[in-house]
Amino acid sequence: MEVRRRAPLPPPPGRVQAGDALPLPIRHTNLIFSALFAASLAYLMRRWREKIRSSTPLHVVGLAEMLAIFGLVASLIYLLSFFGIAFVQSIVSSSDDEEEDFLVGPARGSSAAAAVAPPPPPSSPAQCSLLGSPHDDAARERMPEEDEEIVSSVVAGKVPSYVLETKLGDCRRAAGIRREAVRRITGRQIEGLPLDGFDYASILGQCCELPVGYVQLPVGIAGPLLLDGQRFYVPMATTEGCLVASTNRGCKAIAESGGAVSVVLRDGMTRAPVARLPTARRAAELKAFLEDSVNFNTLSMVFNRSSRFARLQGVQCAMAGRNLYMRFSCCTGDAMGMNMVSKGVQNVLDYLQDDFPDMDVISISGNFCSDKKPAAVNWIEGRGKSVVCEAVIKEDVVKKVLKTNVQSLVELNVIKNLAGSAVAGALGGFNAHASNIVTAIFIATGQDPAQNVESSHCITMLEAVNDGRDLHISVTMPSIEVGTVGGGTQLASQAACLDLLGVKGANRESPGSNARLLATVVAGGVLAGELSLLSALAAGQLVKSHMKYNRSSKDMSKVIS
């Protein structure tokens, strides 16, 4: 079956458009201009032959000839424009190879960013005709006949689902058709998954393939977080009750004690390809070449060609037999930077191939990076932004706001976060619940939630200061991987959350400063969350608070029934 583009729906009454001034159908317009072109051309050719026979100068033209020339030019422009656009569209939409590349090609940016969009308004003017209920016959009756035919072809396997956006030219319509096809194939109800109210064109080829809707997540605000003299209202997307409230209490304690201070220790994204050499000796020669400071300027020049923001910082190598793992680190501006550093690494590998033709590149990523996996190299060397955030909480705030005392908090941190994590053999997990805050902020601001693995590496330290009266608390997070451009940051909801923090988009005056500021806000949020949860544990309030905010008897009754 051939999937055809459907003409756009007519505008609602009262809305005047420019096309309303043309009462003729497009086929009649094409016929008129084609006839005008043929008639004008025939007339001018006849007059040209007559002038040649009578030796009349060709540049002498009458009114009729001028009108014919005007008609010829006007009709030619119209026909070239009309058929030229149709020709280009047919080329773009007819290549099956390009459709395959679109399906399996590498994702751009942070592909797993969640689409946290607001629910559609009750009286939305553009409601979906494909409601997705297996028992809703009325929905099927309202479905256009052409869409019904396409759905049937997708279900039968005649039309691949992944080509719908390309063939139809309407991302919203493609999502609706795919959704209905999935409903019929599975026989499952999905009407609870919203379809309308989301810009599907914004994720095409960038954030998510084969969309059928979007997931709604509530976004809460914790704050103000007083950090480095600025007040931030921190957006957190979560379904865990008590999390935002607890973080908010931590923010209050920090603000009433004068605020927190942060420092960015390092800023560099990494990528580590792995290459195999004929012998271990040969691999060692390549290792020495890469780590020799004499060659760094040349490698840096080759690497930095990938982007005007990419700046190679260093290369760290490790060997396993004759396999060489090369960990490149570079500054990536306000982008999280995985694509940027990967392009730079590819440039260097191509350059090295000239001097080391026996080098066999196994993979652009050899897991020495290390991305989306807990790894000692990230814990020790850092990846992304390495941040330390600290605050001194006054004694009266500990008692009045946190409902505990300094000594109990210090003792709990040692026994739980330090000794307990050591007993568990934790890697980067010397904290109470840093991952909770990191993930909630990541989802709200369009980061890659999977990078919560290394971004949540954190060690929380508590000490009694000022003769034991006040509490010094700090979090050290060596690998916060965030960006303010690319990936899910361009989605409307996530961009709004970034704008709330004042870090939306790239900073033109100081490239990279927006991403670094976002990393410090994440660390500040973790500081607040750690302070509040440890206080709840020390005071024995954890179970009570979760029973109040994280559990509902009404919801439980639904589950039981």
UniProtKB/Swiss-Prot annotation:
Keywords: Endoplasmic reticulum, Glycoprotein, Isoprene biosynthesis, Membrane, NADP, Oxidoreductase, Transmembrane, Transmembrane helix. Signal peptide: none annotated. Residues 113-146 are annotated as: Disordered. Residues 146-561 are annotated as: Catalytic. Glycans are attached at N304, N550. The keyword Transmembrane applies. The chain crosses the membrane at residues 25-45, 69-89. SUPFAM superfamilies: NAD-binding domain of HMG-CoA reductase, Substrate-binding domain of HMG-CoA reductase. It holds the Pfam family HMG-CoA_red. One of its GO terms (molecular function) is hydroxymethylglutaryl-CoA reductase (NADPH) activity. GO terms for cellular component: endoplasmic reticulum membrane; peroxisomal membrane. One of its GO terms (biological process) is sterol biosynthetic process. Catalyzes the synthesis of mevalonate. The specific precursor of all isoprenoid compounds present in plants. This is 3-hydroxy-3-methylglutaryl-coenzyme A reductase 3. It comes from Oryza sativa subsp. japonica (Rice). The gene is HMG3.
